[in-house]
Amino acid sequence: MASAQEDLIDYEEEEELVQDQPAQEITPAADTAENGEKSDKKGSYVGIHSTGFRDFLLKPELLRAITDSGFEHPSEVQQVCIPQSILGTDVLCQAKSGMGKTAVFVLSTLQQIEPVDGEVSVLVLCHTRELAFQIKNEYARFSKYLPDVRTAVFYGGINIKQDMEAFKDKSKSPHIVVATPGRLNALVREKILKVNSVKHFVLDECDKLLESVDMRRDIQEVFRATPPQKQVMMFSATLSNEIRPICKKFMQNPLEIYVDDETKLTLHGLQQHYVKLEEKAKNRKINDLLDSLEFNQVVIFVKSVSRANELDRLLRECNFPSICIHGGLPQEERIKRYKAFKDFDKRICVATDVFGRGIDIERVNIVINYDMPDSPDSYLHRVGRAGRFGTKGLAITFSSSEEDSQILDKIQERFEVNITELPDEIDVGSYMNA
């Protein structure tokens, strides 16, 4: 888990360049390159434009390699998955080819790896040797400035004695192994490859791997030989409803992302509603919601620093345990407040969009957009804070103008979701894990 200081390095708030308005008074109560042909091949994703890879707080060596590859903006899959995957969360992701699934597990494992000579930390399984080489090339591309990290590929059809050579010298043996299931199981069974130090277990094109009885058996045998506490990530372009439960048997409370096409991205388990109201009624409504809803922790998003400060002050006057975080704070104070919220000292955080990118608090299960986000992209960043580690969350968006209504329409169209009006009563079980 990253430290609070690491979580908050180098955030900039271009989004806050809006005209400040005082809060109302409150009343109490690709695949990146899934081609892998040339390590210097340029590419670009049509992703969320306000976010760059630097917002994920990756190692400088990784950012440099990403820049060399010509990638500027992460794809939607990457910007939803990477903030969680680099924290060790299990991931089950379905998205068509070209959306950057490979880069999710390559970057997240390289971010977390601490190479030790003679120890394999990462296992990546795939169903063909061609795909294995593509993945190895991706590791080579992104680890070019991490000279101590070594990757090797293994597959059937060649004498296993050749594979033994790769593990003889600990100073040269791989930390990351990409392999087909049959050969990997043979290496483990013959005690050529020791898997007692594995921390990351990845299946690429997992449906192909798990639908085959033979490959599934090999995978299960290798899986059982690895430590019980490890990160498991599975990716595929196609993931039927029948295969998903099988995938999840290998996982613990995974982040589930299913992208059926370039526009549709569903955060499963997230209830999404709007409230139509006048600007002057927002504070009364936020007060009512905080009184009536059950929550672990809440993030309330506003559009400017001054509104964050004012709303935070008003909430505290009403005895709500609030704290505010925005880019106008000195770095040291920002880290201190972030840590207080992360450590559960405070249950309510009023924030600007600085909190909507790559920041993850396990207990947050409700997000309230006090001010409408300025774009569908910003909406996705914000509501993604809720229920990230679990399967349930609640997002409530205030709409107080015609412009707000238009943005809400764009959000629903972009992500093909139906955001309904907040009902008078909402079932706690729909947004709180039991």
UniProtKB/Swiss-Prot annotation:
SMART domains linked: DEXDc (SM00487), HELICc (SM00490)
Protein name listed in UniProt: ATP-dependent RNA helicase uap56
Pfam families listed in its UniProt record: DEAD, Helicase_C
Motif annotated as DECD box, chain positions: 204-207
Entry-linked SUPFAM superfamilies: P-loop containing nucleoside triphosphate hydrolases
Enzyme class: hydrolase
Domains (record comment): The Q motif is unique to and characteristic of the DEAD box family of RNA helicases and controls ATP binding and hydrolysis.
Molecular functions (GO terms): ATP binding; ATP hydrolysis activity; mRNA binding; RNA helicase activity
UniProt similarity note: Belongs to the DEAD box helicase family. DECD subfamily.
Biased composition (Acidic residues): 7-18
UniProt xrefs under InterPro entries: DEAD/DEAH_box_helicase_dom, Helicase_ATP-bd, Helicase_C-like, P-loop_NTPase, RNA_helicase_DEAD_Q_motif
Region Disordered: start-end pairs: 1-43
Domain Helicase C-terminal residue range list: 269-430
GO CC list: nucleus; transcription export complex
Gene: uap56
Reaction(s) this enzyme catalyzes, per UniProt: ATP + H2O = ADP + phosphate + H(+)
